[in-house]
Swiss-Prot record:
Primary subcellular site in the record, as a coarse category: cytoplasm
PANTHER family per the UniProt record, alphabetical: METHYLTRANSFERASE (PTHR33603), RIBOSOMAL RNA LARGE SUBUNIT METHYLTRANSFERASE H (PTHR33603:SF1)
Binding partners and assembly: Homodimer.
Enzyme class: transferase
InterPro entries (alphabetical): Alpha/beta_knot_MTases, RlmH-like, tRNA_m1G_MTases_N
Top-rank taxon, per record: Bacteria
Matching CDD domains: RlmH-like
Cellular component, GO annotation: cytoplasm
Organism: Shewanella sp. (strain ANA-3)
Subcellular location: Cytoplasm
Name the UniProt record assigns to this protein: Ribosomal RNA large subunit methyltransferase H
Length: 156
């Protein structure tokens, strides 16, 4: 199974790139974690946010290979504990499909992305900066993988 993190925003600070890559490289080849960056729409004083969200959403959906299981990261989503995320990851593997996880921009996800989702995950009730979300998601997925494989990374 492949995991695909599709996130709005490019040109992240080095600490974000290094943090994400640290967890990305830990995954085994049979569960690769890929990052796809979607350019953020230009925001300004008179920006048409609805149009920007729509365009970002179209680009995100276009980046998802046909047949992937889609999970949005969104406040109304499910709050998973590590064991619950590990269980969800097991189900994804048994389903036999790759997984695309969608992280929106400053205004969140386009309605079309939310409608296309099979699941929604609330990473935190806190508002987190989007660059940090990439690292937290990568670490959380790696930790869930470690639970499923009895790897010593996760300790109860």
């Amino acid at each position: 199974m492949k995991l695909q993190l599709i996130a709005v925003g490019t040109r992240m600070p080095d600490w974000v790139t290094r943090g994400f890559e640290e967890y990305q490289r830990r995954f085994p080849r049979d569960m690769a974690l890929e990052l796809i960056e979607i350019p953020a729409g230009k925001r300004g004083k008179n920006a048409d946010i609805v149009r920007i969200l729509q365009k970002e959403g179209e680009q995100m959906l276009a980046a998802i290979p046909k047949g992937n299981h889609i999970v949005t990261l969104d406040l109304p989503g499910k709050n998973w504990t590590t064991p619950e995320l590990a269980t969800a990851m097991n189900k994804w593997q048994l389903d036999g499909r790759d997984v695309s996880l969608l992280v929106g921009g400053p205004e969140g996800l386009a309605p079309a992305c939310k409608e296309a989702a099979h699941q929604s995950w609330c990473l935190s009730a806190l508002t987190l900066p989007h660059p940090l979300v990439r690292i937290v998601v990568a670490e959380s997925l790696y930790r869930a993988w470690s639970v499923n494989t009895n790897h010593p990374y996760h300790r109860e």
